[in-house]
Structure formats: C-alpha cells, structure tokens
C-alpha cells in the first residue's frame, strides 16, 4: 500500500489521458489510475489498488476522464469595443480597404482601447478569461498590440499582470507592439518600428511586463526587414520571440522567426516546405489558428502533411480577437482544426496541451500529466478525449484543478 504524506491530495478511480508521448497508447491513456498531488505538483501516478479506498483528501472520480489542463497559446484577450458592424459591412460587400478608410479595421480597436479605462479593460478581459477557464484552460497567453503606443501597450500588459495576480489561471504575457502601423505613423512605418525597438521593448522588458516579443510579418503588417529589426532587438536583450507569419501571403516570415529560434510561427496558411524545414531546424512550433481562417473565409490551408513529415510540433489556439477570430472557445478551435485543417483529434489534443506548452516555453512544467509537472488538470464527464473535440457546443467539464486546488 502506498503511504501518503500529510497534505497529499489524491484523485483516484480515473481514466487518465496523460498526453505523455513516452506512453504508447493514444493520448497516453492509462486506466484505473490514481494521481497523487503534493504542493501544487504531480507527485506520482500509481494504480489505484495501491491506495486506500477512502480518506481525507482522497477524491473518487468514479471512472471519469482526466486530461492535462488546456493551454490557449495565442490570444488577444485585452481590448475594448467590437467590430460587429464592420463584419456586417464585409458580408454586404464592402472591401477591407473601404472599411479601413472609414477608420475601421485594427485601428478602430486601437482607438477604442486607447480611450478605455484600465479598470474597464480588466473587467472585460477577466470575463473572457473566466470563459476560457470554464472550458478547462489553465494556462493562457495574452498579447498586447491594441495600443501601438508606449502608454497603452503598458496599460494592456498591466491588465494581463493583474489577471495573473488573481491566481485563477497562469498567464503568459506577450508584447505585440509590432502588430500594425498606428494612424499617426501611417506614412512612416520604419519610424514606428524604431519606436518599438528603441523605446517599447527595452522599457517594458525592464519593468518585467512580458515574457516574449511577437510581431506581424505580412503584406498588411510589417515587411521582413522591419520584422528582423524587432527580432534583433529582442534577441539582444535575451527575450524569446515568436511571429504571426504566412497568414495571407508567403513572405518568408517563418524562416525569419526560425532563424532566431522562435518559440512559434503562428497562422502559417501560406507556409512552404523551406519554411517547414526552417521551423524544424529552429525548434519552432507551428500554431494553427482555425478561427481566423473560418471567420475570414480563407481558402489556403496550412500544410499539415508537410508539418507531419518534418515532425514539426503543431499547436492549436483560439486567436480570440475582435477583428478576425471572435471565438472565446478552445474547444471550438480544436474542432475547427480537425474539420478544416485535417488534424486528428489526438493531434488537436496535443495541440492544446504539450505542443501549446512548448509554444510558450513551458514544456518542462505544463501540458502533460507526469511526475514533477504542475498539477493543472481537468476531470471530464466523458469516456474518451475525442468527445470534447467532437461536440464543442457541449462542455462536459466536471472539475478543473489548478495548482493542485479544485477551482
């Protein structure tokens, strides 16, 4: 009989989808197991026959499914306003250029976010965060990028820090100052990149407000030379990098980010084989964002088969934002990744657990159920992991455990 220490907590009588690749079964499944949690971490996984049937801090899950906590590794959670009106305009035939000329597009969100009080932004973002938590998310990336000026970018990152301080969910904050050229720099995008590189990145990094630097390398964003300036600045300061790349065209952004050992290359609909090879060589995760693909009614799909062939880890994320992916649901993103991009359900699960953890640099502590990892996991009223992917409108979450505590 396994001896428990005072303070240990046990979840017994569970069907465990560990997502541990060292286990041979699909999803790393093992039956009739018990989890021992100690000081917020997984202490051990043992057959339930080795434990007492009942006792203090022993939870009988009656055969329910347990998975790692979900990880949403790409969101734009902090913003004000919405873009429903311009979405309706687009569906009625208005072009993106026409909408932008009227002050719409990303600059509409920038204007609303700049004008919004920090406390209001916090309350808006908190509600969104709790929606994701209700689906079993325990680690969440939050990007800035709707300020495009020092003061507002800092405001957005302070909101992310305030959310993290609640200890309801882990937050990985990302500086995305190189998201778009603000209206005041419309005729001088290089000047704006200078502001990002010489002021925003060093000052906000010194304040400890973010974990990584992101950028938008695209025909409607920043070119390769401008993007490389951002990457060089970040790397000189020892900051991890990532990038929105190859979403609408092939510019070579994935190769660029991979040369700087980027954590991830995100979107990647137009990714080519050279880019896939570069990602493999750079250890860069490919992050699929099917919500934006769906909402923009795109037709160019990411090269999933090439990513498999080159064994590039593939993550899946919600990309929750007001303009191109207003879907605050990781379950829906998993379903879309399977239906639209051809992932298997097991690949989708890997994409919101261990591969998503790698995309945030947290692969040594998050995304799997194994000894030594954080005790972040979800108990589901389900028999198989595929059920969560198959029916995204139904949430079978029974219990969410964060840092070893039921939340």
Curated annotation (Swiss-Prot):
Positions annotated to bind N-formimidoyl-L-glutamate: 146, 321, 323
- Residues bound to Fe(3+): 74, 76, 244, 319
**A biological process term (GO) from this entry:** L-histidine catabolic process to glutamate and formamide
The cross-references to InterPro entries, in alphabetical order and at most eight, read: Amidohydro-rel (IPR006680), HutI (IPR005920), Metal-dep_hydrolase_composite (IPR011059), Metal_Hydrolase (IPR032466)
Q: Which Gene3D superfamilies match?
A: Metal-dependent hydrolases, Urease, subunit C, domain 1
Question: What residues bind Zn(2+), as annotated?
Answer: 74, 76, 244, 319
A Pfam family matched by this chain, by name?
Answer: Amidohydro_1
Q: Which domain of life is it from?
A: Bacteria
Residues given in the record as 4-imidazolone-5-propanoate binding sites: 83, 146, 179, 247, 324
Q: Identify the cofactor(s).
A: Zn(2+); Fe(3+)
- Cystine pairs annotated here are none
State the reactions this protein catalyses. 4-imidazolone-5-propanoate + H2O = N-formimidoyl-L-glutamate
Looking at the UniProt record for this protein, which Gene Ontology cellular component terms does it annotate, in alphabetical order?
Answer: cytoplasm
Q: Where in the cell is it found?
A: Cytoplasm
Entry's Gene Ontology molecular function annotations? imidazolonepropionase activity; iron ion binding; zinc ion binding
Keywords, A to Z?
Cytoplasm, Histidine metabolism, Hydrolase, Iron, Metal-binding, Zinc
Major subcellular location class: cytoplasm
Enzyme Commission number, as recorded: 3.5.2.7
What pathway is it annotated to? Amino-acid degradation; L-histidine degradation into L-glutamate; N-formimidoyl-L-glutamate from L-histidine: step 3/3
Q: How is the cofactor bound?
A: Binds 1 zinc or iron ion per subunit.
Q: What does this protein do?
A: Catalyzes the hydrolytic cleavage of the carbon-nitrogen bond in imidazolone-5-propanoate to yield N-formimidoyl-L-glutamate. It is the third step in the universal histidine degradation pathway.
Name the protein family: Belongs to the metallo-dependent hydrolases superfamily. HutI family.
UniProt name for this protein: Imidazolonepropionase
Protein's organism: Salmonella typhi
């Amino acid at each position: 009989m396994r001896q428990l220490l005072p303070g240990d907590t046990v979840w017994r009588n569970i069907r465990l989808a560990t997502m541990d690749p060292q286990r041979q079964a699909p999803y790393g499944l093992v039956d009739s197991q018990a989890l021992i949690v100690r000081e917020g971490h997984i202490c051990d996984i043992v057959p339930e026959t080795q434990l007492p049937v009942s006792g203090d801090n022993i939870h009988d899950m009656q055969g329910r499914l347990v998975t790692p906590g979900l990880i949403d590794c790409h969101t734009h959670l902090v913003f004000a306003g919405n873009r429903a009106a311009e979405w309706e305009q687009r569906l009625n035939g208005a072009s993106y250029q026409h909408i932008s000329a009227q002050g719409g597009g990303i600059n509409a969100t920038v204007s609303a976010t700049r004008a919004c009080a920090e406390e209001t932004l916090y309350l808006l973002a908190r509600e969104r965060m709790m929606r994701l938590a209700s689906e079993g998310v325990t680690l969440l990336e939050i990007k800035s990028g709707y300020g495009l000026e020092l003061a507002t970018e800092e405001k957005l990152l302070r909101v992310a820090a305030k959310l993290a301080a609640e200890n309801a969910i882990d937050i990985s904050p990302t500086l995305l100052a190189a998201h778009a050229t603000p209206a005041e720099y419309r005729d001088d995008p290089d000047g704006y990149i200078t502001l990002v590189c010489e002021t925003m990145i060093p000052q906000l990094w010194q304040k400890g407000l973010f974990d990584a630097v992101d950028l938008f390398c695209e025909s409607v964003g920043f070119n390769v030379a401008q993007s490389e300036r951002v990457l060089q600045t970040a790397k000189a300061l020892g900051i991890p990098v990532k990038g929105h790349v190859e979403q609408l065209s092939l510019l070579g952004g994935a190769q660029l980010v991979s040369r700087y050992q980027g954590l991830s290359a995100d979107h990647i609909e137009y990714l080519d084989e050279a880019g896939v090879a570069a990602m493999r060589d750079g250890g860069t995760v490919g992050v699929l964002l099917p919500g934006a693909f769906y909402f923009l009614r795109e037709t160019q799909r990411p090269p999933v088969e090439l990513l498999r062939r080159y064994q590039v880890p593939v993550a899946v994320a919600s990309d929750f934002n007001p303009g191109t992916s207003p879907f605050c649901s990781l379950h829906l993103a998993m379903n879309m990744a399977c239906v639209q991009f051809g992932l298997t359900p097991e690949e989708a699960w890997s994409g919101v657990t261990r591969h998503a953890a790698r995309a945030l640099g947290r692969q040594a502590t998050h995304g799997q159920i194994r000894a030594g990892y954080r005790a972040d996991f979800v108990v589901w009223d389900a028999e198989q992991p595929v059920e969560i992917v198959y029916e995204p409108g139904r949430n079978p979450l029974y219990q969410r455990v964060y840092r070893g505590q039921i939340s």
